[in-house]
């Protein structure tokens, strides 16, 4: 497939705050450098949270008001829009049920599914939501728990595997974030060699800052959390639990939590109830570059992550990450031997607290990990990612 002049469509449900949405934006800019036109499609667009790149080769179209993504109506609408724009490749970076891929392939359009999370992440998410004791009155909690258990029962693991097997058979390329994820999918879905050959590996890009990062010894003694304040995946409440264990040992350190989400009110109440010192909820920030420059350590406390975009962003800025060893993506970024940060056994809060305390008190360790992490980010530079896309397009 000829790359220069190629027209590609990327479809999301919405363009707003989110790692996958940010990666799509970065990818469109990379495509532009290759002479590829990118056409974004979505139901909604939050301009304050997601900015369309100012580039003549990149545009955004919203579905007609009231039209839902991946219905018969929207599938026909998209096929017409693709034909009008000369789209040859559709990239789907979201995990929505889609029964209309055969219709799109019948129009002569190649399909790439881009999985931004760990394999079968939905099972973990459903488990966490089903066991979640919401911070609400008991009657709301009972209703919520009953509803989630019902949904869990109706959406079995085998149904999910069947859906993914069908998806593999309906796309021309299935992208995962790490080689380990490919093996997990092949094993979990029982795929044959032909089906396995459709997989490709594409890590997320990392961008080194324009200016040399501040050395670890000169950084403010500040611990950061950057991400959505949600329970099932990000678990920001663990940050508070861990900080409670170490705050008295680290009197000259502070914690700043950046993000917004459903857990914000609970976190504020928890901070007040436990009277946790030197920890602040800072709210949503559109560009975290300045935040990373002001911190020394990034805490990730997620139950599951596909990649953890904030990990590579922090590493590129010289911030040392610490995270639970909960996925291959996190291991890829931090290193199985904690070469580029600190890995902690899931989900041992005491072990996490011990590692965090050590990291805060040992500036030489922080310096060594910071330098190693910055070098590691070169493996995910735009130049290296570009060559991977060129290989994928050449094989379609």
Outline where the language-model segments fall.
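N-terminal strand-loop element at the rim of the active site
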Residues: 10-17, 24, 30-69, 181, ...
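A conserved mid-protein helix/loop that constitutes part of the nucleotide-sugar donor-binding site
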Residues: 21-26, 221, 230-245, 262-268, ...
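Short His-centered aromatic/hydrophobic patch
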Residues: 92-98, 115
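A short, active-site helix/loop in glycosyltransferases that binds the activated sugar's phosphate group
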Residues: 149-197
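Acidic anion/phosphate-binding donor-loop and adjacent secondary structure
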Residues: 186-189, 197-220
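Aromatic "clamp/platform" in nucleotide-sugar-dependent glycosyltransferases that forms part
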Residues: 284, 303
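Short hydrophobic beta-strand element within catalytic cores of glycosyltransferases
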Residues: 320-324
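Conserved acidic donor-binding segment of nucleotide-sugar-dependent glycosyltransferases
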Residues: 325, 335-350, 358-363
């Amino acid at each position: 497939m000829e790359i220069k002049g190629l027209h590609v469509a990327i479809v999301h449900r919405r363009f707003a705050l989110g790692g996958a949405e940010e990666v799509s934006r970065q990818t469109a800019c990379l495509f532009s450098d290759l002479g590829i036109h990118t056409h974004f499609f979505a139901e909604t667009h939050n301009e304050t949270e997601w900015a369309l790149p100012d580039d003549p080769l990149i545009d955004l179209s919203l579905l007609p008001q009231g039209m839902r993504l991946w219905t018969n109506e929207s599938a026909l609408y998209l096929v017409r829009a693709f034909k009008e724009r000369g789209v040859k490749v559709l990239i789907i970076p979201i995990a929505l049920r889609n029964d209309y891929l055969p219709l799109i392939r019948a129009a002569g359009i190649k399909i790439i599914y881009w999985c931004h999370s760990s394999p079968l992440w939905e099972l973990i998410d459903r488990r966490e939501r089903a066991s979640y004791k919401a911070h609400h009155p008991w009657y709301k909690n009972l209703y919520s728990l009953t509803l989630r258990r019902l949904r869990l029962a109706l959406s079995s693991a085998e149904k999910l595997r069947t859906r993914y097997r069908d998806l593999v058979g309906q796309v021309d390329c299935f992208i995962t974030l790490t080689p380990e994820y490919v093996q997990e999918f092949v094993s979990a879905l029982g795929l044959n060699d032909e089906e396995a050959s459709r997989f490709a590996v594409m890590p997320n890009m990392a961008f080194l800052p324009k200016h040399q990062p501040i050395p670890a010894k000169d950084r403010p003694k500040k611990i950061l959390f950057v991400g959505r304040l949600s329970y099932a995946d990000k678990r920001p409440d663990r940050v508070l639990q861990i900080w409670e264990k170490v705050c008295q040992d680290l009197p000259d350190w502070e914690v700043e939590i950046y993000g917004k989400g459903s857990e914000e009110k609970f976190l504020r109440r928890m901070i007040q109830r436990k009277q946790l010192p030197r920890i602040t909820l800072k709210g949503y920030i559109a560009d975290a570059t300045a935040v990373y420059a002001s911190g020394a350590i990034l805490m990730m406390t997620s139950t599951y992550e596909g990649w953890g975009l904030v990990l590579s962003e922090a590493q590129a800025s010289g911030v040392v990450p610490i995270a639970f060893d909960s996925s291959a993506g996190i291991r890829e970024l931090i290193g199985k031997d904690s070469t580029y940060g600190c890995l902690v056994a899931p989900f041992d809060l005491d072990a996490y607290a011990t590692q965090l305390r050590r990291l805060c008190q040992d500036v030489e360790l922080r310096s060594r990990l910071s330098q190693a992490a910055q070098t590691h980010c070169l493996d995910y530079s735009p130049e290296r990612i570009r060559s991977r896309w060129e290989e994928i397009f050449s094989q379609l």
